[in-house]
Swiss-Prot record:
InterPro entries: Cyt_c-like_dom (IPR009056), Cyt_c-like_dom_sf (IPR036909), Cyt_C6 (IPR023655), Cyt_C_IC (IPR008168)
Gene Ontology biological-process entries: photosynthesis
Protein name (Swiss-Prot/TrEMBL): Cytochrome c6
Cellular compartments annotated: Cellular thylakoid lumen
Single GO MF annotation: electron transfer activity
Alphabetic keyword roster: Electron transport, Heme, Iron, Metal-binding, Photosynthesis, Signal, Thylakoid, Transport
The keyword Signal belongs to this UniProt entry's keyword annotation: yes
Signal peptide segment: 1-25
Subunit annotation: Monomer.
Listed transmembrane segments: none
């Protein structure tokens, strides 16, 4: 009985691990699309045309306490200063996807 339970758990974990990259890729692809249509005008290539020091580059996100999905989601939902709020314009899923995309790009240095 114990062996069977361990086998079932091992199979379940293997399935979850194998599915994660595909799900993440789909989120990043949607995040890229949402970013392109809603964010790129001000944040092309991870920059910031309004406030040059507050970019989406990893170092700036870390410096300003924004290097987490939760922080980016809050900022996108509520806006700040010249950045408009996107809650109501974008779905929660779109906002989550764009946050994941921003973090992914920041980790890659916005190299693509």
């Amino acid at each position: 009985m114990k062996k069977r339970f361990i086998s079932v758990c091992a199979i379940a974990i293997a399935l979850l691990v194998s599915l994660t990259p595909a799900a993440l890729a789909a989120d990043l692809a949607n995040g890229a699309k949402v970013f392109s249509g809603n964010c790129a005008a001000c944040h092309m290539g991870g920059g910031n045309v309004v406030m040059a020091n507050k970019t989406l580059k990893k170092e700036a996100l870390e410096q300003f306490g924004m290097y987490s999905e939760d922080a980016i989601i809050y900022q996108v939902q509520h806006g700040k200063n010249a950045m408009p709020a996107f809650a109501g314009r974008l779905t929660d899923e779109q906002i989550q996807d764009v946050a994941a995309y921003v973090l992914d790009q920041a980790a890659k240095g916005w190299a693509g």
